Amino acid sequence: MKQVFAVIKPNSKHREGVIEGKGGALVVYTKEPAIEGRANAAAIKLIAEHFEASRMSVNLIRGHASKYKVFEIYE
């Protein structure tokens, strides 16, 4: 199990994906809007793909209504 800090960039016009930012934080670009948890669901999917894990092994711990989030990944 590891915890990952991520910054979510919803409504991305140019791409969708995960890049490693400064200090080991992830920057997650998603085309989904930050409405009704759609950006959170897309971020979970993209982080799971980035770490080659299943979606069920990625949990949002902190930051449900913020662009700064902490995810827990069970491997």
Regions found by a protein language model. Name each.
Residues 1-37, 41-44, 53-55, 59-75:
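Contiguous, often N-terminal, cationic amphipathic patches that form binding interfaces
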